Amino acid sequence: MEHTHAHLAANSSLSWWSPGSACGLGFVPVVYYSLLLCLGLPANILTVIILSQLVARRQKSSYNYLLALAAADILVLFFIVFVDFLLEDFILNMQMPQVPDKIIEVLEFSSIHTSIWITVPLTIDRYIAVCHPLKYHTVSYPARTRKVIVSVYITCFLTSIPYYWWPNIWTEDYISTSVHHVLIWIHCFTVYLVPCSIFFILNSIIVYKLRRKSNFRLRGYSTGKTTAILFTITSIFATLWAPRIIMILYHLYGAPIQNRWLVHIMSDIANMLALLNTAINFFLYCFISKRFRTMAAATLKAFFKCQKQPVQFYTNHNFSITSSPWISPANSHCIKMLVYQYDKNGKPIKVSP
């Protein structure tokens, strides 16, 4: 069967071969994507459960962003890995009607764009926390964070509508047009070049600031953990998505006809690497954060024993001194202006001493 979803094409046969011919990777793609779905979907669901508990206990913007990222990754795994690849190509083994097929394609682009762009406000949030700690709680608070997340989801969906006309550049009879070139370049800019530029610039400033203030840094502080998670997420994204962008542009402009089989193999591998990005965040969180590991273990233990998790005690109002990694709690009583509590709408209220 031909795989018409060119943006993540990794199916068992393409039009470069005769109908029914086997993919150069054999059954590797279907095995890989099946494992990716079986591993990534439960991992992201568990991540959503844990982060939901953390959001309920602590009014912290970064937890909201990571929660939104996990939800977006679930959508990517569902629409792209399950519906587009496994269901259409291997379970149903038939081409879907054009209109539903294109609608699903728009949802695929929307989910992958959301998964990428939700990390941008997280990066900005960490930049403000590290570089402008005195202003952090007046700029970043739960109510505003939720509005930003909703805006990202809506914007990514609306900007994905033009991808209804996404071209199938992988077919043998594909004829390139200027409109297709513009759409493909917009895709490359929006999913990789622009986000990576933002990540590189802001992360570089954060690293410089942390090194400059290293003598005052509070080791093991939560902001350090969140910043480490941010660096890891963005670095892995840039690494795993680079081959896919390179292969799209190479095939669009310079793939020789005699090397189409090799280009197909390399494109399949590039797409596998790109989608791997949606399934590994849970394991990164467990590796970096002891709190996340502990909560994951408790959640799994309660699930397999069919028991309720113990209710964690926390106050009705969360108090936060600062997200700066170099202000010691021992000296926090001297910083009266930085003590906040949150109202029922999640907006900060300064507490008088």
From Swiss-Prot:
Membrane topology, Extracellular segments: 1-29, 87-102, 170-181, 250-268
Cellular location(s): Cell membrane
A Pfam family per the record: 7tm_1
Tissue expression per record: Expressed almost exclusively in the brain. Detected at very low levels in the peripheral tissues.
GO BP annotation list: G protein-coupled receptor signaling pathway; phospholipase C-activating G protein-coupled receptor signaling pathway
A GO term for molecular function: neuropeptide receptor activity
Membrane topology: Multi-pass membrane protein
Gene Ontology CC: plasma membrane
Signal sequence range: none
Glycosylation sites: 11
Cytoplasmic-side positions: 51-65, 124-148, 203-228, 290-353
Listed transmembrane segments: 30-50, 66-86, 103-123, 149-169, 182-202, 229-249, 269-289
Keyword line: Cell membrane, G-protein coupled receptor, Glycoprotein, Membrane, Receptor, Transducer, Transmembrane, Transmembrane helix
Family: Belongs to the G-protein coupled receptor 1 family.
Job description of the protein: Orphan receptor. Seems to act through a G(q/11)-mediated pathway.
Protein name stated in the entry: Probable G-protein coupled receptor 139
Species annotation: Homo sapiens (Human)
